[in-house]
């Protein structure tokens, strides 16, 4: 008997199953950090005429403790952002629920060996992890107190493997972010509206320049050499062991010019 009430939904973790509810709700844990963060609706639902909802995604695939290292916490946050973005971008998806809000107790055969599942964007005591800022930053601010600005890196080199910095992202609902080193202005960054997170209301912002014009100001380098050197340093900050062919060519060019 069909009642005049809100649509019903269940939860399932396999494709093309029998639909007994009004909405096909699917636990989509397909994402492994590359490619699309959710499966195509047409490949999952058994009835494309009915509504479709991603009932779970995210945290279960990358358990993250609040005391995990900076890189691990950032990966979790970016995975949540990818899930949110791709569910918004895909036509016909009513919405998505990240699994889950907070870490929780579990039995000894599950979780991380301590009877705790670290799937949440908050810990068990509701203290936010970095990934909580992904959700908080999607609110459009109506007053200064509504501004969210969470930087993924603590900039503590001694806490990073080999003392090598990695990617730095800002989760914010501000229109732009300005970076200073002391009183020296470095650069202003805005969301990439055509990038990986373009479907989000407020995409996270990658900070990819930590040098700006400081080499010209303090080292007396000419603009061309300063620009090339800054590009190399910024790339080394992200991955010092795997420089691109372009950066290697820049290093060679700088060596030749300095030897002249």
Which role fits each region the language model picked out?
Residues 1-131, 144-159, 183:
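Substrate-binding/catalytic cleft of secreted carbohydrate-active enzymes
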Residues 86-260:
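Carbohydrate-binding surfaces of carbohydrate-active enzymes
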């Amino acid at each position: 008997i069909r009642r005049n009430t809100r649509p019903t939904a269940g939860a399932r973790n396999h494709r093309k199953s029998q639909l007994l509810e009004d909405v096909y709700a699917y636990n989509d844990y397909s994402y492994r950090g590359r490619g699309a963060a959710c499966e195509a609706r047409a490949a999952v639902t058994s009835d494309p005429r009915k509504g479709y909802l991603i009932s779970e995604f995210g945290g279960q695939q990358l358990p993250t403790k609040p005391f995990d290292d900076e890189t691990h916490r950032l990966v979790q946050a970016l995975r949540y952002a990818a899930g949110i973005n791709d569910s918004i971008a895909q036509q016909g998806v009513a919405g998505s629920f990240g699994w889950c809000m907070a870490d929780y107790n579990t039995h000894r055969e599950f979780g991380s060996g301590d009877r705790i599942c670290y799937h949440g964007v908050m810990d068990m005591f509701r203290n936010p992890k970095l990934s909580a800022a992904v959700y908080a930053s999607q609110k459009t601010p109506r007053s200064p107190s509504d501004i969210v600005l969470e930087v993924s890196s603590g900039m503590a080199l001694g806490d990073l493997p080999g003392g090598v910095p990695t990617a730095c992202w800002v989760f914010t609902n501000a229109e732009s972010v300005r970076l200073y080193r002391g009183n020296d202005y470095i650069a202003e960054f805005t969301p990439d509206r055509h990038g990986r997170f373009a479907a989000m209301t407020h995409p996270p912002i990658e900070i990819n320049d930590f040098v700006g014009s400081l080499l010209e100001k303090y080292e007396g380098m000419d603009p061309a050499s300063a620009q090339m050197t800054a590009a190399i340093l910024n790339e080394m900050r992200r991955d010092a062991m795997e420089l691109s062919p372009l950066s290697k060519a820049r290093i060679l060019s700088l060596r030749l010019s300095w030897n002249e």
